[in-house]
């Protein structure tokens, strides 16, 4: 279910304040955040935000196509390493 239109999109206030401050000064540096639920706003385009995936911070460069999506969509939390391989031992058990 989507968020109510009367509430508007959510973005962490501290994250947005840091972005606004960097836009005013023209500074470009990586911003660490744990706020995966924050919506990407147009002011964030061109910045790199390090989004926490539960273990480390994944650097995400924000482009225009990402506006309207959530930060967490670009930092996967699970890593698929593949299904078990068919070995000599596993086939002998059958």
From Swiss-Prot:
GO terms for molecular function: rRNA binding; structural constituent of ribosome. It holds the Pfam family Ribosomal_S19. PROSITE patterns: RIBOSOMAL_S19. InterPro entries: Ribosomal_uS19, Ribosomal_uS19_bac-type, Ribosomal_uS19_CS, Ribosomal_uS19_SF. It comes from the Bacteria. One of its GO terms (biological process) is translation. Keywords: Ribonucleoprotein, Ribosomal protein, RNA-binding, rRNA-binding. One of its GO terms (cellular component) is cytoplasm. Protein S19 forms a complex with S13 that binds strongly to the 16S ribosomal RNA. HAMAP family: Ribosomal_uS19. Belongs to the universal ribosomal protein uS19 family. This is Small ribosomal subunit protein uS19. It comes from Pelotomaculum thermopropionicum (strain DSM 13744 / JCM 10971 / SI). The lineage of its organism: Bacteria, Bacillati, Bacillota, Clostridia, Eubacteriales.
